[in-house]
Amino acid sequence: IAEAPEKYLRAGMGDTLGKYFECHFAARGDRLEHSSALGREISNMCYFPLLEYAEAALEECRHKKAGKALEQAVLANIVSTGLVSLLVLDQYNCAVAHSVYYGLVLLDGFEAENLHGDVVAYGVLVQLLVDGEEEKAKEMKTFLKNLKIRTTLKEMGASVKRETLREVLHEIVTGPDMEHIPYEITEDMVYDAMVKVEELVG
């Protein structure tokens, strides 16, 4: 993994961060059975180790070095996410962040230019703002920018114009990852969050 392109490690981190935020969001208010409750707790290990080790892990990968930081990031990216996916019910595996990805890839050429995990990380910002967590969104935007993950539609080569995003917004709110969430989310809510992400100062 230390010899692999850095961009794939980075994208893996973005997808892994999504696991933490989406699992906690989708499970909110539910009385979880043991397996799903355990998986949700393990999802913390998809987040906190990356806060500590992600930047150093990318630096190690850049220099083809298999050090402690890279090891911890890989454990989060592969082991922690795998355990969560196996333990929780499917309805707790994804939420807004992944649905944002599946909406945006409807745009011509978008998927070819943006890795899955990078877009999921952007989707985390959208999810946080939909949920009213502006300060957390600012904190996460700063973190993602430090990892060199694109944090706006403009950076990803897409327009934030409502008409351009018409099909995208429909897919986001009607996609299968949105079937089990704590409250109804509308196209207006998602679009407003996307606009805020563009302007958010992290």
Q: Where would I find each of the regions flagged by the language model?
A:
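A glycine/threonine-rich phosphate-anchoring loop and its flanking beta-alpha core
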Residues: I1-I42
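Active-site segments that bind and position negatively charged phosphate/pyrophosphate groups
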Residues: L32-F143
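C-terminal charged capping/lid subdomain of soluble metabolic enzymes
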Residues: E133-G202
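A short secondary-structure junction motif
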Residues: Y20-R28, A57, S80, L107, ...
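Short alpha-helical scaffolding segments that buttress acidic/His motifs in well-ordered protein cores
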Residues: L17-F21, L70-V84, V124, L144, ...
